[in-house]
Amino acid sequence: SSAASDVYKRQEGHVQYAFMTIREIERFYSQYYPRWDARAYYGLMELLAVAPGQRIARMSCGQRSQVALGLILAQNADLMILDDFSMGLDPGYRRLFVEYLRDYARSRGTTVFLTSHIIQDMEKLIDDCIVMDYGRILVQMPAGDLLGRFRSYELAIAEGAALPEAPEFHRPTAIGGRAEFYSFETEAEVAARLRQAGIACDTLRSEALNLEDAFIGLTGKY
């Protein structure tokens, strides 16, 4: 029906018309969304330093992607679904949008469901974290706790020696006299466990992880 068609138009995505300018495409889409908020769109355009009269056809792929995302934000929806939103964005534009999206969602109370293959993008957006491996939950905790507690460890060991088998040591490897593993234990706790197994830990060192490193440490590199 016509009524149903109108509802779908308000909830579906958009088509980008390259012959339009920044201002023209905003005016065009504003007709179809009753909760349209042009400020959300133009706020992002100002950060991109693009003029309202600039034609989309003359913009880079990254800028065009940001225009598309700005049009989505302007719809002022209660729920936004962004599937692989970072495709086509270089690191600078990606970070700009992530920070803009974070502030947008917090100020409006908007629910945002998003997917991304770039895990570090999530660090600025999430409060709680669930890491799964083939349907099995490995970790469920606040993201700050995961990044604050889970660390990588490295030390020199005798050729042919092996780390002790312990559930506290995640993804242990020993190659060429170097051992690496991940753990939620503190450096003092790890050192005590190694000494108990008869392994010298004078060369033991630990390193804090970002979210991507933590994910690899929990699930494996491949």
Q: Model features per residue range: what roles?
A:
Residues L96-E185:
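ABC transporter nucleotide-binding domain
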Residues S86-M87, I119:
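Short loop immediately C-terminal to the Walker-B catalytic DE motif
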Residues S1-Y8:
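Short, small-residue-biased leader/transition segments that mark boundaries at the very start
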Residues M80-D84:
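Catalytic Walker B motif of ABC-type/P-loop ATPase nucleotide-binding domains
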Residues Q11-V67:
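ABC-family P-loop ATPase nucleotide-binding domains
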Residues S183-Y222:
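C-terminal coupling/interaction segments
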Residues P91-Y93:
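Helix N-cap at the start of a conserved alpha-helix in ABC-type nucleotide-binding domains
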